Design a protein with these regions (language model features):
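Pseudouridine synthases involved in rRNA/tRNA modification
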Residues: 109-165
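Short histidine-centered loop motifs in beta-beta connectors
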Residues: 100-103
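RNA pseudouridine synthases
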Residues: 1-86, 90-95, 139, 155, ...
Length: 165
């Protein structure tokens, strides 16, 4: 096992699995954090949602986080604490529950969960945002991260078992 510090570059909600990026040096952490801030680190997710969204979409919303409830809401007007959120998605498989692939342009707390739920497509297993099924946690997975590193794009991918079914 290698010794030394490890620096997480981004976060995932507690009940979300998938690809994470860590740095082994402070210099690498600074460079990767800059990629996140500048939007050159591309994060993609897969999710299983209730219902059938359109074939693809580009959604922008204003989100407000109520920290006392650890819940996020879509709101109509900008005010203190409101943040802009944007994502794009493609429906991969549609039906009563649909598989979608999502590209985040912003990384807001609970962003994917609340943006889909607010349009009537809560994530399967996401009881906080409207799912009424028997799954124990949201079917949401960080499946791909791409970022520039030393002149070339690095890409890391993984899929959950449920995305293949």
């Amino acid at each position: 096992m290698l010794g030394g510090e490890v620096f997480p570059i981004h976060r995932l909600d507690k009940n979300v699995g998938g690809v994470m990026i860590y740095a082994r040096t402070k210099q690498a952490a600074a460079a990767l954090s800059k990629a996140v801030q500048e939007g050159t680190m591309v994060k993609e997710y897969v999710a299983m949602v209730h219902g059938t969204p359109t074939e693809s979409g580009d959604w922008s919303d204003l989100l407000f986080k109520d920290s006392s409830k650890n819940k996020v809401f879509v709101v109509k007007k900008e005010r203190k604490g409101v943040k802009k959120a944007r994502l794009e998605f493609k429906t991969i498989r549609s039906g009563e529950d649909s598989l979608v692939r999502i590209r985040l342009h912003t990384g807001r707390s609970h962003q994917i969960r609340v943006q889909f739920s607010s349009r009537g497509f809560p994530l399967v297993g996401d009881h906080k945002y409207g799912s009424r099924d028997d799954k124990k946690e949201p079917m949401l997975f960080s499946c791909c991260i791409t970022f520039p590193w030393k002149g070339e794009d690095k890409r890391f991918e993984a899929l959950p078992d449920w995305a293949d079914k």
